[in-house]
Design a protein with these regions (language model features):
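Acidic, glycine-rich two-metal-ion catalytic cores of nucleic acid-processing enzymes
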Residues: 2-12, 16-19, 25-53, 57-66, ...
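Conserved DEDDh/DEDDy metal-dependent 3′-5′ exonuclease domain
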Residues: 2-12, 16-152, 156
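A generic structural signal for alpha->beta connector loops
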Residues: 78, 95, 376, 408-412
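Helical catalytic core of nucleic-acid polymerases
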Residues: 89-160, 165-175, 219, 227-345
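Generic structural signal for residues in well-ordered beta-strands
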Residues: 98-100, 379, 411-415
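Structural motif corresponding to the C-terminal cap of alpha-helices
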Residues: 153, 176, 368-373
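Polymerase palm active-site segment centered on the conserved acidic dipeptide of motif C
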Residues: 156, 190-193, 393-427
C-alpha cells in the first residue's frame, strides 16, 4: 500500500482508507517558521485506528504537487481531527472538528530520524530546510510523532476552554504586526525568515506554560516586554489609520475581588484601601501590590478585601496539600504537586491568578473578535493586561462596542492611540 499522495487517484483511495477520526500534522518549510507565512510542504493524515498514515505532498520537490484546497475541503468531512497544535494547524485549516492534544497533555517529542538530526544541525539557518530533507524521512518522522501522541488520543476529553484559547490566539497571530523600514535597526534577527514576511512580523503565543498564561517570545523577540525607552516600539505601525491600545487598570485586584465576592464601595480597590488607612492612592496601590504578591501585613489583615483574599489562598492551599493538586473548575487546568516543587501558598495563589487572568481575557478576546470579524480593524497584539488594535476609522461603531465589553464586565481601562506603538497618547 502506498504512503505518498501526489495524484488524484491516490487521493481518492485515501478517502476510503480513513475513518471518521484522524490525526493531522502539517510539515512547514522550516520547523521553526511561523505557519502564517507559507502553506505547508506536506500534510500527514492518519486514521487513529490504522497501522500507518499517508503524506499528501503540496510543495516538496521530490514528488508531484497535489491541490491543497481539495484536501482542505476533505478535512471538513471528518468527525474529529486530532493534532499536536491546533493553533498551528488553524493557519492551514480552521475547523470546529479539530482538537489540540498538547493543551490536553503537553508532550515534547525529542525522537528524530537520523536525517532530521543531521540536516537540522547543519542547515538550521536555511529557510527551506525541510525541502532538503527527503520526503520519505518526513513521513517516517510523522509516524514517530503519531506513536507518541496515540496514548493521549485514547484518553482525550474535549475541553471548550482549550478550543477558545487556541482560536483567539490564532486569530491574533494571523494578522501579524506591520513594521516600518527601521525594524532591522532595532531588532537584529539572525533568521528573519522565521517571522518576517514583506512589511509584517508575526507573533507566536506559547499556550503550554506552567500557569497557562501565554508567553509571546518568538524568533528572539519578546513581544510581551518590548522596551519603552529606546524607541524600538516606533517600528510597529498601523496598516490602517492608527493604533489603539486598551489597557486594563488594577486588573489583578479587580479579578481577585470578583473571585472572592468583594463589594468595593468606590469601585476601585486602591481607593478603598487609601480611604480606610488614610493615604493617597499611589501609596495604597504599592501596598496592595506588595501584599497580593508577597504576604498580607498584620496591620492590614482586617481590610475586607484582604480577609476574603486570605481565605481563598488558604482554601486553594488546603486542597493542593490534601489531594496533591488544585483544579481550576472553569478551565480544567490542574496544578499538580508533582510538577511544582518548592511551592508555597502565596506562590500557588499567584499561579492561579495568572491562569484566571488568561481565562478572563480569552472571554474578552472572543467578544472583540466577534465584533471586528470581517472588518478592516485588526487585533494585533495581546500582553496580559493590554490589547492592541490596528484601527480603521470607518469602524467607529465597532470600537464603541469593544469599549462596552470592558464596561459590562466592570473592568477599568485606559485607552491610548497614535501613529506607532511608541507614541501612543491618552484618548
Amino acid at each position: 500500500m502506498f504512503w505518498l499522495v501526489e495524484t488524484q487517484e491516490q487521493f481518492d483511495k485515501v478517502q476510503f482508507e480513513l475513518g471518521p477520526e484522524i490525526f493531522v500534522l502539517p510539515i512547514q518549510r522550516h520547523p521553526e517558521m511561523h505557519p502564517s507565512i507559507y502553506a505547508p510542504l506536506c500534510l500527514y493524515l492518519r486514521d487513529v485506528t490504522q497501522p500507518k498514515g499517508f503524506l499528501v505532498n503540496y510543495f516538496h520537490p521530490e514528488a508531484l504537487q497535489f491541490d491543497p484546497l481539495q484536501v482542505k475541503e476533505y478535512l471538513r468531512t471528518f468527525k474529529k481531527i486530532y493534532t499536536p497544535d491546533k493553533k498551528a494547524l488553524s493557519h492551514t485549516y480552521f475547523g470546529t472538528n479539530t482538537y489540540d492534544l498538547n493543551l490536553f497533555e503537553h508532550k515534547e517529542v525529542k525522537k528524530q530520524t537520523h536525517a532530521h538530526s543531521y540536516f537540522s544541525q547543519r542547515y538550521h539557518t536555511e529557510e527551506d530546510l525541510n525541502l532538503i530533507i527527503p520526503i520519505v524521512k518526513h513521513f517516517e518522522q510523522c509516524e514517530i510523532i503519531f506513536d507518541e501522541y496515540l496514548p493521549v488520543i485514547k484518553k482525550y476529553i474535549p475541553n471548550e476552554y482549550h478550543d477558545d484559547l487556541s482560536n483567539v490566539f490564532w486569530f491574533i497571530e494571523r494578522n501579524g504586526l506591520k513594521v516600518n523600514s527601521a525594524f532591522e535597526r532595532y531588532f537584529d534577527l539572525k533568521r528573519p525568515f522565521l517571522s518576517r514576511y514583506n512589511s509584517y512580523t508575526f507573533t507566536q503565543y506559547n499556550l503550554n506554560t506552567t500557569t497557562g498564561r501565554p508567553s509571546n517570545t518568538f524568533n528572539s523577540l519578546n513581544f510581551a516586554a518590548l522596551p519603552k525607552e529606546n524607541g524600538s516600539r516606533s517600528v510597529f505601525v498601523p496598516r490602517n489609520d492608527f493604533l489603539l491600545e486598551i489597557d486594563l487598570t488594577a486588573y489583578h485586584p479587580t479579578l481577585i475581588g470578583q473571585m472572592v465576592g468583594y463589594n468595593s464601595p468606590t469601585g476601585d480597590i486602591y481607593e478603598d484601601f487609601a480611604a480606610e488607612y488614610g493615604m493617597d492612592r499611589t501609596e495604597a496601590k504599592g501596598l496592595v501590590f506588595k501584599q497580593l504578591y508577597g504576604h498580607i501585613f498584620d496591620q492590614y489583615k482586617d481590610f475586607e478585601f484582604f480577609k476574603l483574599t486570605q481565605k481563598l489562598i488558604e482554601q486553594i492551599w488546603s486542597t493542593f496539600m490534601k489531594t496533591g493538586k488544585y483544579t481550576v473548575e472553569q478551565t480544567g487546568k490542574v496544578f499538580k504537586q508533582s510538577d511544582l516543587p518548592n511551592m508555597n501558598p502565596q506562590k500557588l495563589f499567584n499561579y492561579v491568578i495568572q491562569h484566571w487572568e488568561t481565562y478572563s481575557n480569552v472571554a474578552i478576546l472572543k467578544e472583540i473578535i466577534y465584533i471586528i470579524n470581517n472588518k478592516e480593524t485588526k487585533l494585533v497584539l495581546y500582553t496580559y493586561d493590554a490589547f492592541l488594535l490596528d484601527v480603521n476609522k470607518q469602524d467607529k461603531e465597532e470600537i464603541k462596542q469593544i469599549l462596552t465589553v470592558f464596561k459590562d464586565k466592570n473592568l477599568q481601562i485606559k485607552t491610548s492611540y497614535g501613529p506607532d506603538y511608541n507614541t501612543l497618547q491618552p484618548l
